[in-house]
Swiss-Prot record:
Species in which this protein is naturally found: Escherichia coli (strain K12)
Keyword Repressor attached: yes
Name of the molecule in the record: Replication regulatory protein RepA2
GO molecular function: DNA binding
Listed GO biological process terms: plasmid maintenance
Record's compositionally biased regions (Polar residues): 1-14
Length: 85
């Protein structure tokens, strides 16, 4: 069997239609993401010392999580620590 025959038989199924539309702008994607999380999450903005921000980033990277997840973890850890005092 030649290669052209193999190519025809291996791709004999129907191909799906081209579905890619216009890309969604980043601002709109972010708005949709925030809307999905609005019931369980609240926005948080803080200005902290650069060295502490760098350490937060390092801690999050070591754990393989986002900085937001690292902040949640640190807060939960502190709440548990205070409950045992």
């Amino acid at each position: 069997m030649s290669q052209t025959e193999n190519a025809v038989t291996s791709s004999s199924g129907n191909k799906r239609a081209y579905r890619k539309g216009n890309p969604v702008p980043a601002r709109e994607r972010q708005r949709a993401s925030l809307a999905r999380r609005s019931n369980t999450h609240k926005a948080f903005h803080a200005v902290i010392q650069a060295r502490l921000k760098d350490r937060l980033s390092e801690l999050a990277d070591e754990e393989g999580i986002t900085q937001a997840q690292m902040l949640e973890k640190l807060i939960e850890s502190e709440l548990k620590r205070r409950a045992t005092l």
